């Protein structure tokens, strides 16, 4: 086995663990110990990172440090299978930064279909300069339901360490997304067990 990308938080531990095992034996062991689990990978999810830097929206434009963070991030280190648009000419034609910010369903859906993604998240980072201090905030939208699924409080940042702060935001969102996937599927399993008991 190997363990990578370990993350420790209050009452939560996550890591990418690669193991060779007999699935049925492991599942039986977890059941015997009363440990809830879900063993499938999450859906392929298109990440569309936009940065609003002092009221200038940047998606495909260069530089987009928020897009660059996701490009450098190991996309396979999470339960959800994150993918990024390549930024080719047809991507630019399909979806502009304004379209993404306005959550234009059909344009987002078309881009997601191109990348064979079953989900699409618009990750908007706002960077504001207020009284010579920079503030950063992330708001994540589900591109299909148009709902806010994740947000952070406005925090002070320093432009010299902006990349570090953006990296933390990416990690926080990825952890949230993984936890949500596990919770939703544990809920489904528990409902199925309840229904079977009722029958």
Regions found by a protein language model. Give the residues of each.
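Edge/loop elements at the starts and ends of beta-strands within beta-rich repeat scaffolds
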Residues: 8-12, 38-43, 130
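N-terminal segment of the mature soluble domain
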Residues: 58-105, 199
């Amino acid at each position: 086995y190997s363990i990578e990308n370990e993350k420790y938080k209050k009452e939560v531990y996550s890591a990418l663990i690669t193991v060779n095992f007999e699935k049925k034996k492991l599942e039986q062991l977890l059941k015997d110990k009363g440990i809830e689990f879900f063993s499938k990978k999450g859906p392929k999810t298109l990440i569309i990172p936009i940065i609003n830097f002092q009221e200038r929206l940047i998606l495909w434009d260069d530089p987009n440090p928020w897009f660059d963070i996701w490009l450098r991030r190991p996309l396979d280190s999470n339960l959800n299978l994150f993918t990024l648009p390549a930024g080719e000419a047809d991507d630019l034609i399909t979806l502009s930064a304004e379209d993404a910010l306005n959550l234009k369903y059909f344009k987002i859906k078309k881009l997601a279909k191109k990348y064979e993604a079953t989900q699409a998240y618009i990750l908007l980072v706002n960077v504001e300069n207020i009284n010579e201090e920079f503030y950063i905030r992330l708001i994540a939208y589900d591109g299909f339901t148009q709902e806010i699924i994740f947000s952070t409080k406005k925090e002070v940042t320093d432009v010299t360490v902006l990349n570090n702060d953006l990296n933390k935001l990416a990690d926080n969102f990825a952890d949230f997304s993984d936890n949500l996937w596990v919770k939703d599927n544990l809920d489904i399993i528990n409902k199925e067990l309840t229904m079977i008991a009722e029958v």
